[in-house]
Swiss-Prot record:
Annotated protein name in UniProt: Gene 66 protein
Lineage: Viruses, Duplodnaviria, Heunggongvirae, Uroviricota, Caudoviricetes
InterPro entries reported for this sequence: Calcineurin-like_PHP_ApaH (IPR004843), Metallo-depent_PP-like (IPR029052)
Example of a GO MF term: hydrolase activity
Domain of life: Viruses
SUPFAM superfamilies given in the database record: Metallo-dependent phosphatases
Amino acid sequence: MSNTWFTSDLHIGHKRLMEIRNLADDVEEHDATLAKAWDSVVGKDDTVWILGDISSGSTKGQIHALGWISDRPGRKRLILGNHDGPHPMNRDAHKLVGAYWMVFEHVSTAARIRVPLYGDAGGHTDVLLSHFPYVGDHTSEDRHTQWRLRDDGKILIHGHTHSPMILSRHIHRRQIHVGIDAWGRLVSRDEIYDLVNHIHEEEGVHT
């Protein structure tokens, strides 16, 4: 049976992020560590959602990261982040679109998935995917606010913050951070389902 995985902010080949992240001593080791974490769990029929920022954002860095992702198993879907060239915030967003579509079966700025609810009531809830959280950043002020989704009460799975926290409840009670900085690995569908149900039970959300 195939699985679905979630991650964000891989920053393949990105020296500055590697130094901040403290997963490895150099970029090559950092990328190899992430490759091992991916390859050890993802099957060829699995789906991997990457919620943005595959690289440093330079043209060379993006091409390198696309090659790295292409070498990994699974079907890949991308939610664009601010370091990804095809994001419409970038003036030259059109230049690398073709290269991205060679690697990913889906490329967009946001998406929606359906998560089953546990318990006697059953049913499901819709959950949004975006690189950006509703609120929060790794800087003192929220950036790229014009590209963030409007909070209409749905749970949001995101990256971008580089926070070690999975649920930043003091900032927002319906956000799930799937970035490498929080997990150090890919997040499984069942882990997402458990977190969504936990939030749904505690907060009550729009389905």
